[in-house]
């Protein structure tokens, strides 16, 4: 694949305390209380994720869950349980459409959310974020046998770009390349089918999501990086959403994520779910939200 990029691991400065396995102590009265730590201690955690995104959050025909977000979330809650000497909790998965994420957290319908949840200033006003646990960029999905599209600029010749109703990625491309034609569909899966049938020439969203589709339908699609002036077209930092101002749980999540990088679990999750060619680049460390001020 063009522009293949070596995966860059986060956690360049993993804390010595985490590597040494120092135990994090939850509040003494967490049992019977509210919030993520209480849910883990009590043995039942409700986690929000996507049900329809291959490689990230997917409900399988046997009702099991799979995907990168699923693996990360399961690792985090089990790691927090281990740190505190608790049994691994039972996880109840809850389908979490993008538009409902903050509401589900605020209403207490989920204890945490890992669902391609990009951290941004507006969302940070409503919920706390653990992470970021990965950085991804906007990219294109095209048919494997269509050699017309090798770069972003190749779209600017009247080609048709799939746009999901209410989403912004395709419009961002249109703003830069006026020659692009947008075709709207309700879901990304509908875009994928339209692309497969030749009704559109490309679709765009986060590279992680596109690699999931490419992995699911190997040989049919390929992912094209999008750059502008030599830089990624956009940056999207994925986080784990929890109740606003739950600092203790946020710190516990970040410690679990640091361990996940240090023991190699994240690299394994990434490759298993999104394939060897997944161009996901990690930068920074969990707990570093300085990008919100950029």
UniProtKB/Swiss-Prot annotation:
Among its keywords, does the record have Lyase?
Answer: no
> Which keywords belong to this entry?
Amino-acid transport, Cell membrane, Lipoprotein, Membrane, Palmitate, Signal, Transport
Q: Where is the lipid attached (N-palmitoyl cysteine)?
A: 27
Q: Which PROSITE patterns match?
A: PROKAR_LIPOPROTEIN (PS51257), SBP_BACTERIAL_3 (PS01039)
Q: GO CC terms on record?
A: extracellular region; outer membrane-bounded periplasmic space; plasma membrane
Q: Name one GO biological process term.
A: amino acid transport
Signal peptide positions on this chain: 1-26
Source superkingdom: Bacteria
Location in the cell: Cell membrane
Q: Which Pfam families match?
A: SBP_bac_3
Q: Which Gene3D superfamilies match?
A: Periplasmic binding protein-like II
Chief place of localization = membrane
Q: How does it sit in the membrane?
A: Lipid-anchor
Question: Which residues lie in coiled coils?
Answer: none
Q: Does the keyword 4Fe-4S apply?
A: no
Which residues are the lipid attachment points (S-diacylglycerol cysteine)?
27
- Subunit text: The complex is composed of two ATP-binding proteins (GluA), two transmembrane proteins (GluC and GluD) and a solute-binding protein (GluB).
- What does the sequence similarity comment in the record state about its family? Belongs to the bacterial solute-binding protein 3 family.
Q: What's the stated role of this polypeptide?
A: Part of the ABC transporter complex GluABCD involved in glutamate uptake. Binds glutamate with a high affinity.
Recorded protein name is: Glutamate-binding protein GluB
């Amino acid at each position: 694949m063009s522009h293949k990029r070596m995966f860059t691991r986060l956690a360049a400065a993993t804390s010595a305390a985490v590597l040494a396995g120092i135990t994090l102590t939850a509040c003494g009265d967490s049992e019977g209380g509210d919030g993520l730590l209480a849910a883990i201690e009590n043995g039942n955690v409700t986690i929000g994720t996507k049900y329809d995104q291959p490689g990230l959050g997917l409900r399988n025909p046997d009702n099991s869950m799979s995907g990168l977000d699923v693996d990360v979330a399961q690792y985090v809650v089990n790691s927090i349980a281990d740190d505190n000497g608790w049994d691994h909790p039972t996880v109840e998965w809850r389908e979490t459409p993008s538009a409902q994420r903050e509401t589900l957290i605020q209403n207490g319908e989920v204890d945490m959310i890992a669902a391609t949840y990009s951290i941004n200033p507006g969302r940070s006003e409503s919920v706390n974020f653990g992470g970021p646990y990965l950085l991804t960029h906007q990219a294109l999905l095209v048919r494997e046998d269509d050699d017309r599209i090798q770069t972003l600029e190749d779209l600017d010749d009247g080609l048709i770009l799939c746009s999901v109703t209410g989403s912004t990625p395709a419009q961002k491309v249109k703003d830069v390349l006026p020659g692009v034609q947008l075709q709207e569909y309700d879901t990304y899966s509908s875009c994928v089918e339209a692309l497969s049938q030749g009704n559109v020439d490309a679709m765009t969203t986060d590279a992680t999501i596109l690699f999931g589709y490419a992995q699911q339908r190997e040989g049919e699609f390929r992912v094209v990086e999008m750059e502008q002036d030599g830089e990624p077209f956009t940056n999207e930092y994925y986080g784990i959403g929890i109740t606003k101002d739950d600092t203790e749980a946020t710190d516990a999540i970040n410690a679990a994520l640091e361990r996940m990088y240090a023991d190699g679990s994240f690299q394994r999750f990434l490759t298993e779910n999104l394939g060897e060619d997944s161009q996901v680049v990690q930068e920074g460390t969990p707990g570093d939200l300085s990008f919100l001020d950029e």
